[in-house]
From Swiss-Prot:
Protein role: Involved in mitochondrial migration along actin filaments.
Organism: Clavispora lusitaniae (strain ATCC 42720)
Residues covered by region (Disordered): 1-479, 511-550, 571-648
Subcellular location field: Cytoplasm, Cytoskeleton, Actin patch
Protein name stated in the entry: Altered inheritance of mitochondria protein 21
Bias-annotated ranges (Low complexity): 18-29, 409-433, 623-635
Coiled coil start-end: none
Length: 648
């Protein structure tokens, strides 16, 4: 970590060196210029430093101060009372406030009674100023590395001694309360005007002269340009810092009696403005820089008015305490009431000088902010003792906290997917083949049941019946095979012994059985082939034929019909006894002509065939035979023959 350096204090001008007596040491310690508080945690620090005053919360609107009447509140200037007078109007204050403040400064330069009291006032607490200075140096050295909090913590250290001095002076107490309330409501510096103090004390001119001497130590017109350059460029502290501090204190007493010219006032005013601009570059908050710029613009136009008023009122040349006018207007532009006593006017002028001192000390603090312990000690010795640090508290006011900027939302960067690198050796054909292998095979469609059965019929191999082959028992040599062949030629198949079976007969029987079984199995297979005739295409199922037409049976009748009937009939009867037998026999043998004609003629055959019944013919034959019997009654035995021909 780089250690920042503190810029060296600018050298004194020639005019100041000539007027400084080297032998006369400074009789009284110079007052400490109070530092202007920063706006981060100012209210909290002041409440912790002084246990007597509780923290005052912020209020949305400005209210009346404690002990302030309505008439005093109405007499205050509107520009100082409203936020627009300080924030929105570019820091320009009315000329009446500036004239009144300059008049009070002129009145405060007049000698008053009570120089001894003013000399004792910085040491009200009774503490050793050297011890207080060591405490301040330790506090500044511990927090020098933290640039954002060093000023606020220095304020808290100085506020610890504030409470003891406030107990001694009641009028300072009331003013601190009123200024803290105004700062809480405004957020920026506001001014309390016309505050009446019951127990007002006259401030001696010696204290004011001490404050003037602090400002006189600044360079004059001869060193105006080198001061601005050296304030910006940081340099290492010189070894003669202690000697310069002694010479500075000796020169204070001589400068108190030495008046300043109007030209010196203008040059010192310009130097103060340059310092204010350099302070903003080094370490001020944006709000402090804005206030200093606004006040500088408002005060440049009113420089001639200030000088004329000071010369008229004081009757002498203006002193160095009036160089804090640009900051004096910023801190408090007090317009006293017409009926105020001179004691109150002196008090208000004292407060204006203190406010200018506070701003001047703040510039020194901001320049010495990043210093370390070793580099900080020679420059802090140049400041006055810490006895008057409680005076800083009256002008310190809380400031706005510094809000850090919100970090931008960073969009996460998503890395791109790496491209798949194909090796040079692999050709595009091999890549395509590898992709083709990885692809799953296409699934075949499910076939219908008829198509599947049709394919199975062709795929099944035909069963060819093969004759059973009996394995040969053992391996025979060539000699044995030749001997067996010769034996078969001689003996044939061998001689069958009783109880032996002929193997050839057994083989023949087995083959016959297999052929028979194959024929039996083949016959039912042929029948379905015959029955599997090509069927006709069926029509729509809605139009069905009747069963009588569906179940038609075609009968093939033969051309000839066979009929069975009895052709001959023989009857036996007992013959009658007659004497003449021979004559009857001859008559019986005679053939009737009708019978002969019926046999010869084919027409008769046709008629008989057409008539199904033959009972009538039999009757006719019987009648004829009976007639013949009557004729042949004389015969012993009557033999009647009937011949019936049935034609088909």
């Amino acid at each position: 970590m780089d250690i920042p350096r503190i810029p060296q204090r600018p050298k004194r001008s020639k005019s100041s060196e000539e007027n400084t007596p080297s032998s006369t040491p400074s009789s009284t310690p110079a007052p400490i210029v109070p530092a202007r508080p920063r706006k981060n945690n100012g209210a909290a620090a002041s409440s912790e430093g002084s246990g007597e005053f509780p923290p005052i919360p912020r209020r949305p609107q400005r209210k009346k101060n404690i002990g302030e009447t309505d008439s005093e509140a109405d007499e205050k200037p509107k520009d100082a009372e409203s936020d627009e007078g300080w924030n929105d109007s570019e820091g320009k204050t009315p000329e009446k406030d500036i004239h009144a403040a300059l008049k009070e400064n002129a009145d405060s330069d007049k000698p008053d009674i009570g120089d001894s009291e003013a000399e004792k006032q910085p040491e009200v607490d009774g503490k050793d100023p050297a011890l207080n200075l060591e405490k301040a140096l330790e506090a500044n050295s511990e927090e020098a590395a933290i640039p954002s909090e060093d000023v606020t913590e220095d304020v808290t250290k100085s506020e610890e001694t504030k409470s003891e001095d406030i107990e001694a002076s009641v009028h300072i107490e009331e003013k601190v309360e009123r200024e803290s309330e105004v700062a809480d409501t405004k957020g920026d510096i506001e001014v309390d005007d016309g505050i009446e103090v019951d127990d007002a004390k006259e401030v001696p001119i010696s204290e004011l002269s001490e404050t003037d001497s602090a400002f006189k130590s600044e360079p004059t017109d001869d060193a105006a340009n080198p001061v601005s350059e050296e304030a910006v460029k940081p340099t290492e502290p010189s070894e003669d810092a202690e000697d310069e501090l002694v010479l500075d204190r000796e020169s204070k007493t001589a400068r108190e009696s030495e008046p300043l010219e109007a030209e010196d006032v203008e040059e010192q005013h310009d130097q103060a403005m340059e310092k204010a601009s350099s302070v903003t570059q080094i370490g001020e908050t944006p709000s402090d820089a804005k206030i200093s710029e606004d006040t500088s613009e408002s005060n440049k136009g009113d420089e001639d008015v200030k000088e004329n008023v000071l010369l008229e009122e004081s009757g002498s040349e203006p002193k160095d305490s009036e160089t804090g006018s640009p900051f004096q207007v910023e801190e408090s532009a007090i317009v006293p009431s017409e009926g105020k006593p001179p004691a109150e006017v002196a008090e208000t002028s004292q407060t204006t000088n203190k406010s200018a001192e506070s701003l001047h000390s703040e510039e020194n603090l901001t320049q010495a902010k990043p210093a370390t312990v070793s580099d900080q000690q020679p420059t802090e010795k140049q400041e006055p003792s810490e006895q008057e640090i409680p005076k800083q508290e009256s002008s310190k006011q809380p400031s706005k906290p510094i809000v850090p900027t919100r970090p931008n939302k960073s969009v996460p960067s998503v890395p791109k997917r790496p491209v798949r690198s194909v090796p040079a050796s692999s050709s595009p054909e091999s890549v395509q083949e590898s992709d083709a292998k990885k692809a799953p095979p296409p699934k075949p469609k499910k076939l219908s049941s008829k198509i599947a059965a049709f394919q199975q019929m062709f795929n099944q191999p035909e069963a060819v019946p093969t004759a059973p082959q009996h394995p040969k028992s053992g391996k025979l040599s060539s000699e044995k095979i030749g001997f067996a062949a010769n034996l078969q030629n001689v003996m044939g198949r061998g001689i069958a012994l009783p109880g032996m079976a002929n193997p050839q007969m057994f083989q023949r029987a087995s083959t016959d059985l297999e052929e028979e079984t194959a024929d039996v199995h083949a016959e039912p297979e042929q029948n379905p082939q015959v029955s599997k005739a090509p069927q006709r295409a069926r029509g729509p199922r809605g139009k069905r034929l009747p069963k009588a037409i569906k179940e038609t049976t075609v009968k093939v009748e033969p051309r000839f019909q066979l009929r069975v009937a009895s052709l001959w009939q023989v009857e036996f009867n007992k013959p009658k006894e007659t004497e003449k037998v021979d004559d009857d026999l001859e008559e019986d043998y005679e053939v009737e002509p009708e019978f002969v004609d019926s046999v010869r003629e084919p027409e008769s055959d046709k008629e008989t065939v057409a008539e199904p019944e033959t009972s009538t013919k039999d009757d006719s034959v019987q009648t004829e035979s009976l007639s013949n019997e009557e004729s042949t009654s004389e015969l012993p035995e009557a033999i009647t023959t009937e011949h019936v021909l049935d034609s088909p």
